Structures are given as structure tokens and as C-alpha cells.
């Protein structure tokens, strides 16, 4: 998993609340069990005018030329609500997004994102609105998300602080998924196993 320390990138926004996982990645695209290849289906029902995904919707934000290559997504409260599917952060990451900034997230989506190297950043509604206004007013506007300092820096230079559980921050800073986190304690696990009485082995 790619470590997340600090990232500066083009920002795009979807100014909507309660964006659920079926909107992020519709159920008909969930048959794969590997993480790659989901980005093309991200927000399928909004991005395309046809079921096959051949006709882009020119009015959808992510399809606008000025936002091509965006790596930071701004959204409103309760992002990632709905059914539990790890494919949602897979699709967002495969599309090229590194961080999602919103006032709140659904709990399961929040945890799944951290486990898959996608940083969910909670800011106040007013702070998110300021970021959206700045991004909308300036083509090519970039935002910096610094996990080492837990700060978001707006296109104008305004700084906003955010919090993240230290365990989640450690995993993201070091690029550790659940398996990687376990392997990082290999020495301690080995010592524990070496000291297990023979009758318990």
C-alpha cells in the first residue's frame, strides 16, 4: 500500500450530501475480487448517459476538462453511506484519488478507506464550503493534505486542522494494510510463539 505523508493535487468537488456506495460504485460492477479496474465505473450512473459507459455525461463534474487528473475530492456530509462494500474505496483510489474531504463519513466506508490507503479528512461544513468556493473560482486550484501535520491547505493558503486516530494515521503514513500491520510486529509475534509452552503448541 502506498504511504500517505503529504499530497498536493488538483481538487474536484461533488456538492452533494449522502452520496452512498451504490452511487460510488453500482452493484453490477462488484463481481471482481481484485482492487484494480474499478475506476472506470466510479460514479457510473452520473458519469455516463448510457448503461454501457460509452457516452460521458458532459455536465458531470468529473468529466469536465478542468478537473481531469484530480486527486482530491470534496463532498458534503455522510459520504459513503449505504451498504458496506470495500469496492467503493477501491474505485475511488483506482480513479486516482488520494484523499476525500467532507464534513462526515459513514463509519464503515471511513474504516475501509483507511484500510485501503485512501485518506478520509473530516473538516467542518464551513471549511468544506470555503474549499469548494475556492476550487470553483479558480481553474487548476490545488489543495494540500499533509498527514504529518494533520493540516489541509486551501488554494489561497488558508490552513485547516483535522484529526485522525493515531492507529489509522500510523497505518497511512507507513503504507500498512491489515496484513502489513501484522507483519510489522513479526519480531514480537516470533518471540511470543517461541515462549509458548510445548503443551500449548
UniProtKB/Swiss-Prot annotation:
GO annotation, biological process: L-leucine biosynthetic process
An MF annotation (GO) of this entry: 3-isopropylmalate dehydratase activity
Keywords: Amino-acid biosynthesis, Branched-chain amino acid biosynthesis, Leucine biosynthesis, Lyase
Gene3D superfamilies (UniProt xref): Aconitase, domain 4
InterPro entries: 3-IsopropMal_deHydase_ssu (IPR004431), Aconitase/3IPM_dehydase_swvl (IPR015928), AconitaseA/IPMdHydase_ssu_swvl (IPR000573), IPMI_Swivel (IPR033940), LeuD (IPR050075)
UniProt entry tagged with the keyword Lyase: yes
SUPFAM superfamilies recorded: LeuD/IlvD-like
Subunit-level organization: Heterodimer of LeuC and LeuD.
Protein name per the record: 3-isopropylmalate dehydratase small subunit
Organism: Shewanella sp. (strain MR-7)
Gene coding for it: leuD
Amino acid at each position: 500500500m502506498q504511504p500517505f505523508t503529504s499530497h498536493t493535487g488538483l481538487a474536484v468537488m461533488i456538492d452533494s450530501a449522502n452520496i452512498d456506495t451504490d452511487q460510488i460504485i453500482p452493484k453490477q460492477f462488484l463481481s471482481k475480487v481484485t482492487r484494480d479496474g474499478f475506476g472506470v465505473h466510479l460514479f457510473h450512473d452520473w458519469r455516463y448517459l448510457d448503461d454501457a459507459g460509452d457516452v460521458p455525461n458532459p455536465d458531470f463534474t468529473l468529466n469536465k476538462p478542468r478537473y481531469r487528473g484530480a486527486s482530491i475530492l470534496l463532498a458534503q456530509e455522510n459520504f459513503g453511506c449505504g451498504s458496506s462494500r470495500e469496492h467503493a474505496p477501491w474505485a475511488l483510489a483506482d480513479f486516482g484519488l488520494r484523499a476525500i474531504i467532507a464534513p462526515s463519513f459513514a463509519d464503515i466506508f471511513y474504516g475501509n478507506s483507511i484500510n485501503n490507503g485512501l485518506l478520509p479528512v473530516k473538516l467542518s461544513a464551513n471549511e468544506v464550503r470555503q474549499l469548494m468556493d475556492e476550487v470553483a473560482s479558480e481553474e487548476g486550484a490545488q489543495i494540500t493534505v499533509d498527514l504529518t501535520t494533520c493540516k489541509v491547505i486551501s488554494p489561497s493558503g488558508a490552513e485547516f486542522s483535522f484529526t485522525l486516530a493515531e492507529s489509522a494515521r500510523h497505518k497511512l503514513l507507513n503504507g500498512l494494510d491489515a496484513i502489513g500491520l501484522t507483519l510489522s510486529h513479526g519480531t514480537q509475534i516470533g518471540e511470543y510463539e517461541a515462549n509458548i509452552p510445548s503443551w500449548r503448541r
